[in-house]
């Protein structure tokens, strides 16, 4: 850059700082780049698929899927992991369907969890914005976008037409809170439902509620689906779950993770540790026996998982090794099976 341009730029920067304050414009090279802080989802495979070890703080995340696919379970698991790190969490229950007992079974400290059950969509989003601006809340869950009913619709008659009200409400709210979320370094997760577009003959007829604003503002979008049942004998004790990262602004997108959700217990984390540990050679599998550092830990996956449950220090050591290997390596160097191979189907539990 020639001297005249340098002087002009310096004068412009000085004027901007004088008018808008120091730091309004800065060179990216003046400050050391820092890794994006993340909060674990409770699923080891999903944390790895997200590329940074979890969901990014200071960003908006959308989780959507069909009914009973595990959306709320995944968000409650995220809250439980955040609380373990000392985070303050809030749950804006627009659906009025939060079960404290189920949340407690997933590891959530319900005594410290902030809960709101707003009457209207405007109230829910205003509460969310105030919690964000407090700079004191680390994780906020909004369950769900479909339940954010505008006040005009609630006060109107059944059958009244309210075209685009919810879409305008979401667009206005997201414009307002996005900057505050970044400044507060707060993770805001919107749970969303799926609807079918009428008259679609070709392509995917599925869409999410709340129009397009959330799709643009979200840094991460997760599509969660139930792919099968987990059985013990003839009894169904859980569900096979697949999560696809359909949008990711902080790492490469379109990776996916498969894990199991056990009813009343949540994400089967030890099963994931065993699967990934075997793939990476951290655990040895010989026939039905699993071994760790030369010592047998169980015959069959269920017994190996029980060993990890009884010896959390071993589980933590294996998980740390998995994270160190997979999160430090570029995506091209990771085993392809981690993205595409389904969870071990033979009685995982």
UniProtKB/Swiss-Prot annotation:
Any one of the GO BP annotations: DNA recombination
This protein's UniProt keywords: ATP-binding, Cytoplasm, DNA damage, DNA recombination, DNA repair, DNA-binding, Nucleotide-binding, SOS response
Protein's UniProt keywords contain rRNA-binding: no
Subcellular location: Cytoplasm
Top-level lineage group: Bacteria
GO cellular component: cytosol
Pfam entry (one): RecA
Annotated S-S bridges: none
Thylakoid keyword on record: no
InterPro entries found in the cross-reference section: AAA+_ATPase, DNA_recomb/repair_RecA, DNA_recomb/repair_RecA_CS, P-loop_NTPase, RecA-like_C, RecA-like_N, RecA_ATP-bd, RecA_C_sf
Binding site for ATP: 65-72
Single GO MF annotation: ATP-dependent DNA damage sensor activity
Family to which this protein belongs: Belongs to the RecA family.
Function in brief: Can catalyze the hydrolysis of ATP in the presence of single-stranded DNA, the ATP-dependent uptake of single-stranded DNA by duplex DNA, and the ATP-dependent hybridization of homologous single-stranded DNAs. It interacts with LexA causing its activation and leading to its autocatalytic cleavage.
Protein name listed in UniProt: Protein RecA
Organism: Azotobacter vinelandii
Organism classification: Bacteria, Pseudomonadati, Pseudomonadota, Gammaproteobacteria, Pseudomonadales
């Amino acid at each position: 850059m020639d001297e005249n341009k340098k002087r002009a730029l310096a004068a412009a920067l000085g004027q901007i700082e004088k008018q808008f304050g120091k730091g309004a414009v800065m060179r990216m090279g003046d400050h050391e780049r820092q890794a994006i802080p993340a909060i674990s989802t409770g699923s080891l495979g999903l944390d790895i698929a997200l590329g940074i070890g979890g969901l990014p703080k200071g960003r908006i995340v959308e989780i959507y899927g069909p009914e009973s696919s595990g959306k709320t379970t995944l968000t409650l698991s995220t809250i439980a992991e955040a609380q373990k790190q000392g985070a303050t969490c809030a749950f804006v229950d627009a659906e009025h369907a939060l079960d404290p007992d189920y949340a407690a079974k997933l590891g959530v400290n319900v005594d410290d969890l902030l809960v709101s059950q707003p009457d209207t969509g405007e109230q829910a989003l205003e509460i969310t914005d105030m919690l964000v601006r407090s700079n004191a809340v680390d994780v906020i869950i909004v369950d769900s976008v479909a339940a954010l009913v505008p006040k005009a619709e609630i006060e109107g008659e059944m059958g009244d037409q309210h075209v685009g009200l919810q879409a305008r409400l979401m667009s206005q709210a997201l414009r307002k809170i996005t900057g505050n979320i970044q400044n507060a370094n707060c993770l805001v997760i919107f749970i969303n439902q799926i609807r079918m577009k009428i008259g679609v003959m070709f392509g995917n007829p599925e869409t999410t509620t709340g129009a397009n604003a959330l799709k643009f503002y979200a840094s991460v979008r997760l599509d969660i689906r139930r792919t099968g049942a987990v059985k013990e004998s003839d009894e169904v004790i859980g569900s096979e779950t697949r999560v696809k990262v359909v949008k990711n602004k902080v790492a490469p997108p379109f990776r996916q993770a498969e894990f199991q959700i056990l009813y009343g217990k949540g994400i089967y984390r030890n099963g994931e540790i065993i699967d990934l540990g075997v793939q990476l050679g951290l655990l040895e599998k010989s026939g039905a026996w699993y071994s760790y550092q030369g010592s047998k830990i169980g015959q069959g996956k269920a017994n190996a998982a029980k060993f990890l449950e009884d010896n959390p220090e071993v589980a933590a050591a294996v998980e740390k090794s998995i994270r160190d290997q997979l999160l430090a390596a570029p995506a091209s160097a990771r085993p392809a099976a981690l993205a595409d191979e389904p969870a071990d189907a033979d009685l995982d539990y």
